[in-house]
């Protein structure tokens, strides 16, 4: 009876999983085309702005980037009926001010040295725990005249780490002399000053009131009082404070003698103190028409808000109306009293780098609190971006160079005198000198005491980078994961979504996994799969089984696999797949796949230093029918593939991705990485051209991600800690154009990633114990989350990863308290290194869960509101399990379904899948039940999937060492989501109920703790 019950339970689970295959939402098609596509036009376009006086004479002109969203007022949704989730502070201080957060007041080492060019540098190193997550790691800061570089290095109790190896990881291998350790505790004050050169933690913004028809700055600054709407706007920005006796951040205003006015507007936002220089609150002089005192403050603000009254048709404000060489960003605010909404327009000086968040379409806000949050974030990000302009960057570089050289001159004499305490250049960092233990402990205690005093002084002064815990900010972030399968017992190698289930390659074989239902075996362990692609639109499964020299590519029909699962067949073995292998791919170590734009499937297989181009023979649109879907399991799609050509390279590629040409008739490209370079290869001619050369002794290639900016291909080249964006210029007369572009940019990750996922507007880097999230357009950091034992397994549509936590079976309070006590700055340890608990304590077991970040959460909530379905008719075929062919009908999809419609569709779909429906003919209102698999298959036969559907994936790469399993899932994904808005079973992908997500990647504490317990 027990056996029969288990069989019935597994059969029921299998039935539920198979039903979900056909319940994919059409949202995926809308999101897929957005994932890898991005446009800088969302961030404005550069215009020449000319201002004139009342007589029409030209006064001034300037080039500014203008952001005004879209002028389309006929949006499908009214402004204010949605909530943005892409409003983030870029490079937030609580993530970037490392020295204050992780070093100051803690035991750490500081070193001084000269590079090969005899320029001095400083290095700070500490070993810290990532917020009691039992993830010890090294943090290092390199201070140079060009700026600071920050990296994290993994901690290993068995592997020694020297200063030389840390500098080598920062690409600094040559020195004039070996670095020497600085023991003087006062060095902490000097290094804190160096970090403060990155910019102020607090901000001052100008607020200028302009009446209707005012065209010059003299007229605007001469407004003695504001209007009622202007006062309402000031109340929205912050609190009105009395300057005399004010003890908070004053923003350059006089708080003793009232020489800069009696009142001002002040607020605190996410730990930042903000003082507004309001024109009507600054001193007014009837004799001075130019109002010099007002211009002195507002004219010296980097960012100024201009509140302009009047109708939309009246002459609008232009930055050239203001005579200021210092103000780089103007935010034009208009208030509509009739509709009670605000309209926003941003002007940025041409040299200011792009910054977010992009304005919505249309840029109108009816939710005033949402408008305040958006405006403050935009202004803070704008001032930070302005500091990266050549003018400010050169000043900061000169100041930093002067401070470093001055500090170097002051310290060198003391270092030469105190040779007894000098440590060897190659000393292991965690070890302290065995001799004079008591003296060393006393020195460390004094070192920590002085550091804590400096930290307290900065906090009292208001210059400390505060955490979000003090700001009360609590919002759901788009990257918040959901638990897909708890207590996953296997080691995942790679995976790919199949409908709403997940096809996972594990150490026990390939399994079909969905939620906490029992896993269904598809292939046994004799077929060790390292890469896979589930192509539902083509009814294909492509995978690479790696078994030494016998490695090959295998192709299967999904319908045949599904039929076998319905028949409760055991998992296929390698011997059962003889008819499904592509013989010429023997010995392959990597492959990449591409289906966007093209009418045919393209696969490039790497066999040592040889590339083999394979395509699938083009099927006619009528080729995909219900009859072909029910073909026998023995029928293999191998005969449908043809070998086009072979291309020989100079070395075996470690990373490979396919790039579409700029037009249908243009040559497609292959980007490969080997040795110390990234090359692009013409698929037609086999010619290879250098794209980028890596200047480093050791190179760890991570990914080459193809993205498309306004239809033009670009590549994100990722290696070591670096990520570079380069435009891919088309072939011209047989030659490849390699030239620098103004759109190219480069940034560094804080921790070396093993996988990168692009989901516009975000770039997600996966490391062994953290997730780092940046923006595609500028590489700015928006979030860092600690995720112990993080392993990415799939990213082609939704992102799936596993994470391991130490779950205490008895109590979770003791270990947490112990970790806190160990890290308390009040009790400095007697060694150079704090003692960390082991990854698993006594009475604890490993718990590995499978998590999911829905793609629609990342790419579906930015720019437009709401996301609109393409208004085109599509031909829909019935779900696969129905054996009777049904007539196809054109259907226009809509994302706005009521709850009753969703339930009705789900119920009708379930009845038809189980063969309980008496109606064989289709109905127009039932069309959404024919989910994405049959629809996409027919779209492919008629001309391929929608452009851009797979554009945001990380490239295929060779796994290395322990990172093999996570990185192979990066293979050029196909952009459709496995999630569904229309399936009640999949309702978990929306806003999860309390407790549905085991941890949240949101900023609640100093390091945004993720609790996996």
Curated annotation (Swiss-Prot):
Residues 963-982, 993-1003 have a biased composition (Polar residues). GO terms for molecular function: GTPase activator activity. It comes from the Eukaryota. PROSITE patterns: CNH, RAPGAP. The modification Phosphothreonine is found at residue 827. Keywords: GTPase activation, Phosphoprotein. InterPro entries: CNH_dom, Rap/Ran-GAP_sf, Rap/Ran_GAP_dom, Rap1_Ran_GAP. Residues 811-821, 952-962 have a biased composition (Low complexity). The keyword Phosphoprotein applies. Coiled coil: none annotated. The modification Phosphoserine is found at residues 45, 426, 432. Residues 191-407 form the Rap-GAP domain. Residues 489-800 form the CNH domain. Residues 810-842, 913-1013 are annotated as: Disordered. GO terms for biological process: regulation of small GTPase mediated signal transduction. Belongs to the GARNL3 family. This is GTPase-activating Rap/Ran-GAP domain-like protein 3. The gene is GARNL3.
